């Protein structure tokens, strides 16, 4: 299975565009002209309405993306377009700096809802390049190739790692990988989350426990899902060290 997929080749079918639009009288309008118009930051709502009614230009993925991410696009139009975007178009849209924050959130949620129906290769590609929210969701994928790529996503945050570690659906392989990861395993909050996780290896749990103040460690172990034998070992080591 290839590690990356070209966007055009990896498009996943989405709902078909709305049939409510009619052919515009402006048959001369081309993709290039529409894109040129959409570069105007002060475009009027009437122009967006005219463009949206033009079935010919709305077949263009570039035009749809430009309209959805334009700051002046009427929200009802932008929302309809977002709901019609293909999988990798949703990923691109969610990373657009000009797109409205609430619409980017919707795009992320649509992507998350499709994860169970897209291919392994597409999930691998998304894991490397998607937004923080989608990368966080892919940390819980059952396939190691997916969550391994998500761990290297440049947009992934410490908070996302901690949230994933708190979920009971995380795999043993994922937890062990985080506990050995050169970037994430040294983060204090990640270490605390690992000490609460049932799958953290004993050797790493001992290593992290040594860095936690005794009182806080007791509180962590009180709610930890680690096996009792490991928790007993951690407590015993603290007693031996006189802490």
Regions found by a protein language model. Give the residues of each.
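Alpha-helical scaffold segments
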Residues: 1-243
């Amino acid at each position: 299975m290839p590690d990356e997929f070209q966007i055009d080749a990896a498009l996943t079918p989405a709902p078909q565009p709305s049939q409510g639009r009619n052919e515009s009288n402006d048959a001369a309008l081309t993709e290039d002209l529409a894109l040129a118009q959409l570069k105007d930051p002060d475009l009027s709502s009437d122009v967006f309405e005219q463009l949206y009614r033009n079935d010919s230009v709305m077949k263009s993925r570039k035009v749809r993306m430009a309209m959805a991410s334009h700051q002046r696009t009427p929200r009802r139009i932008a929302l309809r377009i977002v709901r019609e975007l293909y999988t990798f178009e949703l990923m691109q849209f969610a990373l657009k700096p000009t797109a409205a924050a609430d619409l980017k959130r919707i795009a992320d949620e649509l992507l998350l809802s499709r994860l169970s129906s897209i291919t392994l290769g597409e999930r691998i590609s998304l894991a490397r390049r998607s937004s923080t929210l989608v990368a966080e969701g892919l940390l819980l994928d059952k396939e190691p190739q997916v969550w391994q790529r998500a761990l290297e996503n440049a947009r992934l945050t410490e908070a996302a790692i901690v949230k994933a570690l708190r979920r009971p659906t995380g795999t043993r392989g994922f937890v062990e990988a985080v506990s050995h990861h050169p970037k994430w395993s040294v983060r204090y909050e990640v270490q605390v989350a690992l000490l609460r996780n049932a799958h953290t290896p004993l050797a790493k749990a001992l290593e992290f426990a040594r860095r936690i103040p005794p009182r806080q460690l007791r509180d962590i172990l009180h709610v930890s899902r680690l096996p009792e034998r490991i928790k007993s070992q951690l407590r015993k080591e603290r007693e031996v060290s006189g802490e």
